[in-house]
Amino acid sequence: MLPAQKHTLETLLENSVKQVVQASKGDADAAFVLPAIALERPKVAAHGDVACNVALQLAKPLGANPRQLAEQIVAALTAQPEAAGLVDAAEIAGPGFINLRLTPASKQAVIGAVLAQGRAFGASERDHGKRVLLEFVSANPTGPLHVGHGRQAALGDALANVLASQGYAVHREFYYNDAGVQIGNLAISTQARARGLKPGDAGWPEAAYNGEYIADIARDYLNGETVAASDGEPVTGKRDVEDLEAIRKFAVTYLRREQDMDLKAFGVKFDQYYLESSLYTEGRVEKTVDALIAAGMTYEQEGALWLRTTDEGDDKDRVMRKTDGTYTYFVPDVAYHVTKWERGFTKVINIQGSDHHGTIARVRAGLQGLHIGIPKGYPDYVLHKMVTVMRDGQEVKISKRAGSYVTVRDLIEWSGGATPGSEGSPELLDEATITRGRDAVRFFLISRKADTEFVFDIDLALKQNDENPVYYVQYAHARICSVINEWKSRYGATDALLPGADLSPLDSKQAMALMQKLAEYPDVLAHAAGELAPHAVAFYLRELASEFHSFYNAERVLVDEQAPRTARVALLAATRQVLENGLAMLGVSAPSKM
């Protein structure tokens, strides 16, 4: 049911309920609160198209039999002239459920709506004028992006698209942790490589990173190469193995550039990159700490500065400043979120790994302790669990490039058909490989709820059959394109014939089911945005592809008779459009040929 139709039916039912309540109570209780009208899709198709339990909600306050109330509500509903175009039949089920069957014309209306709105179908202005800052990926610039970052990128970019579809002005932000201990480890790792050392050699630093990418950084530093991140100034290798600060600066910029390349291959763009180091150079960390001290939210104990996080629900107070004068890692996070608030983002969503769960209470406690108007529960979080990569039935734990983990680039190349063991080779980064790999990785990583662990099966991603979910959905789109092209070629037809087509021939069970599934798309987007659950779009696309295949296998589209032929092509055209729209939400291509 389309949103406008749903709103109309809710209004008609609300009017019906008012009539029944008025007849029962008269004007005796003007303060009586009517229950909200909730419409649901019955789990069993035989029970109708729409179910409503309002009679059950009214039974106790009215002291009436719910089945009798349901009968009265249905009588009042069908007596309204506007209901004739929507409601074909009504029945009372069980203790008092109202089950409604919609008219064929009301179901067929979705085709005209989709064809008229095109890529805008499903979008809403519900949240127009609202701003949201969405922070995701936010990897340390100490190595290539790993598969966990890939899951964040897929979730974050899809959620950004979904929120934008509901009218939000979305600001995508990447926070670079470029000021911690790990950056120092990166510098000494690169320095060791520049000195000719390798992992396992005498003198190799214990905290150093072992991946081959460190050797690449050291080589380019010694060769005097120039590197630049997308938002930064170019940095040239100084060739001095003793200048640790020059090495650090070059290595960080080198890896930021590499991460930019990975994100580009993944199809993810950011509006802003925010550097943790800027929080220190601009004095924001000290300012935040001073404000918390002034607010009485801290105390000194055993030479350390503690934050009273228990005042805000944490299980124990937390150290802010250690005895050596350095800050614990959540302190700059508090300062960073203050900047989000000061920039006018009253809604902020962070997508992070589930290992960050412990920092949520600390960051929120710090923000509350500042007493600057930040609401409780700020920011929102979407936490995702780990990704396990499987190939040939075995877990893949490391890659040649990273040394200790599988990278996003590995996953894109493997899923695109690159030869195992040759990851990172420039010749493999052709557009076809990137597109195939990106589509598979993005769809797979968003095809489960964020809070569930995910097994990424490379072998499944390479399959070209119905077992592969992204292939299944994309093939539905490509098959429709093929049928429509054949229709145009064989009959000299054009798209102009479709908007005004007679849709009455679309009366089969399969056609009705497909049209109802198309009409669900706007609600799917609204739900995905409201619940911060972009996986709902992936679920929906698989269901839509399934309904299409059921229809296509049951009914021949290009029949001799023009009326049913044009109607069926119109249904396919609408289905193709919604498949394209949904895939675009996930950042996945909609191929016309496969």
From Swiss-Prot:
One Pfam assignment: DALR_1
Transmembrane segments: none
Disulphide bridges: none
GO BP annotation list: arginyl-tRNA aminoacylation
EC code(s) of this entry: 6.1.1.19
This protein's GO CC annotations: cytoplasm
Compartments, record wording: Cytoplasm
Keywords: Aminoacyl-tRNA synthetase, ATP-binding, Cytoplasm, Ligase, Nucleotide-binding, Protein biosynthesis
Enzyme class name: ligase
GO molecular function: arginine-tRNA ligase activity; ATP binding
Signal peptide start-end: none
Matching PROSITE patterns: AA_TRNA_LIGASE_I
Alphabetical list of InterPro entries matching this protein: aa-tRNA-synth_I_CS, Arg-tRNA-ligase, Arg-tRNA-synth_N, Arg-tRNA-synth_N_sf, ArgRS_core, DALR_anticod-bd, Rossmann-like_a/b/a_fold, tRNAsynth_Ia_anticodon-bd
Catalytic activity entry: tRNA(Arg) + L-arginine + ATP = L-arginyl-tRNA(Arg) + AMP + diphosphate
CDD domains: Anticodon_Ia_Arg, ArgRS_core
Motif ('HIGH' region): 139-149
NCBIfam families: argS
Subunit structure, as described in the record: Monomer.
PANTHER family attached to this UniProt entry: ARGININE--TRNA LIGASE, CYTOPLASMIC, ARGINYL-TRNA SYNTHETASE
Family named by the database record: Belongs to the class-I aminoacyl-tRNA synthetase family.
The protein's name in its UniProt record: Arginine--tRNA ligase
Provenance organism: Burkholderia pseudomallei (strain K96243)
Protein's gene: argS
